[in-house]
Every structure is written in structure tokens, then in C-alpha cells.
């Protein structure tokens, strides 16, 4: 709820992720926020963050960082550890923060992208409310030939 209230009207929002979180990062920015909510975004991999993007981040820039539990976790942790030095408008969503009752620790890395997908879906419910824009409405998709 808080995330949606804070970000529903962002002029631009940056999503950062790596490893098995890259799918959630990319698709959430492009398919959900751009296509379905009509909000401007950019998705970037954690390993590319320090090759340009961090130069455009300011104190107010909206940035969401996804952290998974696979071998690429250190890349996203590096971004998460750095971002507070330059930005006050960031969110870190770490799959480790969500309990997976009955799932062994050694398997979490294989499931963490599903956790992120569930988190994104919960955010979407609140984004629809805040934007007053049902996500099934499109301007062009399946409305015009292209």
C-alpha cells in the first residue's frame, strides 16, 4: 500500500535487478507499469547500474532494487548498499524477507523469482487503486492494427 501511494504518480521510475530477478525486474517495468499502468520506467541490470545509470540518480529519483537469492545476489546487494549515499527515494525488495514455510534454504534460490512475482502482483492491486486505472485497459494493444 505504501509503495503504491508513494510511487503512483512518478514521472519516471527505475527498476534494478539481476540473476533470476531480472525477469521480474524487466517485465514489471515494461509489461506492468508501462503497458498496463501507462507509467514511464526503465529497467536495468544490477551489474550495469554503475556504468551510467547511477550518474542520473539524484536524491529524489524513484529507484526500486530487487534482490534475489541466487549467485547474482551480490550484484544487487552492491547497488542496495550504494544507493542510500545518493538517493532518498529508493525501495529494496529482497526475497529473503519473505518466509517460505516448509522450503529448505538450499531451494530458495530456485523459487525467489516467484516470491518477487507475488510481491509485484500485490503492488499492482494498490497501483490500480491509486492511479484509478484498471490494468486491463489499453490504448492500442488489441485495439488497433499494428
Question: What do these predicted ranges mean?
Answer:
Residues 1-146:
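A SIS-like phosphosugar-recognition module
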Amino acid at each position: 500500500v505504501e509503495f503504491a501511494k508513494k510511487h503512483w504518480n512518478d514521472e519516471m521510475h527505475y527498476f534494478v535487478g539481476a540473476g533470476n530477478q531480472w525477469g521480474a525486474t524487466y517485465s514489471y517495468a515494461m509489461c506492468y507499469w508501462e503497458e498496463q499502468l501507462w507509467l514511464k520506467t526503465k529497467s536495468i541490470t544490477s551489474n550495469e547500474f554503475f556504468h551510467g545509470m547511477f550518474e542520473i540518480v539524484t536524491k529524489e529519483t524513484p529507484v526500486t532494487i530487487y534482490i534475489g537469492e541466487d549467485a547474482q545476489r551480490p550484484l544487487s546487494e552492491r547497488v542496495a548498499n550504494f544507493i542510500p549515499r545518493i538517493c532518498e527515494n529508493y525501495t529494496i525488495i529482497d526475497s529473503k524477507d519473505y518466509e517460505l514455510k516448509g522450503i529448505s534454504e538450499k531451494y530458495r534460490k530456485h523459487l525467489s523469482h516467484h516470491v518477487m512475482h507475488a510481491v509485484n502482483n500485490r503492488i499492482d492491486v494498490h497501483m490500480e487503486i491509486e492511479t484509478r486505472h484498471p490494468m486491463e485497459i489499453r490504448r492500442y494493444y488489441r485495439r488497433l492494427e499494428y
